[in-house]
Amino acid sequence: VDIGIIRPYEVEFNQPDIEDLEQAVREFGHRVKRVYVNMASVRLSREGVSVYQAIGRGVREPVNIDGGILRHLGLIRDFEQLLHRVWVVRAIEAMGVYVVNSAMNWLVASDKLAALMMLAKSGLPVPETESSENMFMAYDAVKRFGEAVVKELRGSMGYGVFKVNDPDVAMNIFSHLLNLSKPMYVQRFLNKKGNGDYRVVVVGGQVIGAIFRRGVGWKSNVAQGARPEAVKPSGELMELALKTCDILGLGYAGVDIAETDEGYFILEVNPSMSWQGFKEATGINPARYIVKHVIDHIKR
C-alpha cells in the first residue's frame, strides 16, 4: 500500500522523525509517498473531490494514497493559510483515506486552549488557565495566580514561554502579543515534583511507553535541555493519557502530565510530537507503532 507522510514542503522541524516514519513504512513492505500540503491543489467537480500536488512548476500528480500520517502544517503566517492546509488534509480524508491524526482533531489538539477546554469539560485535571485578548483581564489573572506561565496558543518545544510573578512585567509581554494580534494564554505555575513532567506516548488507544523529562531550569522540554528518563507509568497516568486521546479523537499523541502535591495535571497534548528523546531513553520507536496502526486500519 501507499502511505503518505503529510507535511509542508518548505520546513521540517524534526527530520529524524520523518526518517523514522519512512523507514518503518519500508520495513513493513509498503511505499512512502511524500505529500506536501503547501504544494497541493484541491479540485472539486461533479466527480467529487480530488487532490493533486506539484513542486513549484513541476509535473502535477494526483495524490493517491491508501493511508496518511499528518505530521504538521508548517509555519503559519495567515489564518486563511492555516485553513487551506487543514482543508487540503480534509480533502484527502474526503477521498476515503484514513489519516492519523485527522485534520480537525489535529487542529483542536494543537491549540492549547481548545484542547484543555475539552479536557476540562470532561472533568479531567488541568491547570487553572485564563485566555483573553483583553490585557487587563490577563493582568488580573497573573495577580490572582501569584506565579504564572504565559504561552502562545500554538507554540511548541517550550519556545516563547515565560514565567512571571510580577503582573507589570507580564503587561510588557501582553503588549508584545497584542501587537502581533495574538491572544494571551495564562496558566497558574505548578510546582512539579522532581522538577519535571511525564510524557506519555499513546498510539492506537494503547500506551506504548513514558518518560520523565527532568528540567535543567523550570522548563521540562527536551528541546530546552531537559533530560528524558524512561519510566513505568502508573495506572493513573496511563488512564489520564488514554482518556485524553479518546476525548480529542487522536490516533497518536504525546500527553504531558505534571505531578504536584495536589495530584496530576494535564499540561498539553502533542498531536505532532517529536520522539527522538523518548526513543533514546526508552528504546521504543513510536514510528513503527504509528505506521502499523495506519496499516491495520487500512486492512480492516
Explain the meaning of each model-derived region.
Residues 159-244:
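Phosphate-binding site of ATP-dependent enzymes
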Residues 10-126:
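Conserved N-proximal alpha/beta basic substrate-recognition cap immediately N-terminal to
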